[in-house]
Amino acid sequence: KTFDRDLIKKLEISDHILISIPPINGKDIVIKYFGEVIKECNPKWVTYLSATSVYGDHKGEWVNEESETNPKSKSGIGRLEAEKSWITFTANSKLLFQIFRLSGIYSNQKNILVRLKSGNVNLINKKNQFFSRIHVEDIANVLFKSLSNFKSGEIYNISDDKPSSPEEVTLY
């Protein structure tokens, strides 16, 4: 596959690389198409944005970075496979690397109020189903702070620390 030469040139001079592209068919395409370029530019900061869906169903129990990963959804399985690919790739390349597992992302344009106004809401009430959320501005702040406080090899959950049921969020 060929890519815009300007994109390759920009990658070659990058010292910070943020991977936010989700896996396609369970595989990370960034390593596939740009791995060698990333390895050669030897960035001082490589961060992969994953998702808390890698944990799967913990029956209402809270999870943290040490919790067992056992994804059931296609996207969660793909994210975990991508994480493993990046961990192996960066270890073999001796690149500094971290993972941020993002919870349910919302913004001013994507949130329950927008869905309520559009009539695109299903009130879900499942026993022991909780999820946390994170605003896009909070994600940006975490990424910015990690530029100067980078710890290679770490995995961080990025969420609001207020797990709620889908019903609670909708009724709020």
Regions found by a protein language model. Name each.
Residues 87-131, 136:
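NAD(P)-dependent short-chain dehydrogenase/reductase
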Residues 8-48, 84:
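NAD(P)-cofactor binding segment of oxidoreductase domains
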Residues 18, 47, 98-100, 156:
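Hydrophobic/aromatic beta-strand patches that form the interior of the parallel beta-sheet core
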Residues 1-8:
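Glycine-rich, highly charged phosphate/nucleotide-binding loops
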Residues 59-99:
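Catalytic helix-loop patch of NAD(P)-dependent Rossmann-fold dehydrogenases
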Residues 4, 25-27, 55:
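Short glycine-rich, flexible loops that bind phosphorylated cofactors or substrates
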Residues 33-74:
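Conserved Rossmann-fold NAD(P)-dependent oxidoreductase catalytic core, especially the SDR/UDP-sugar
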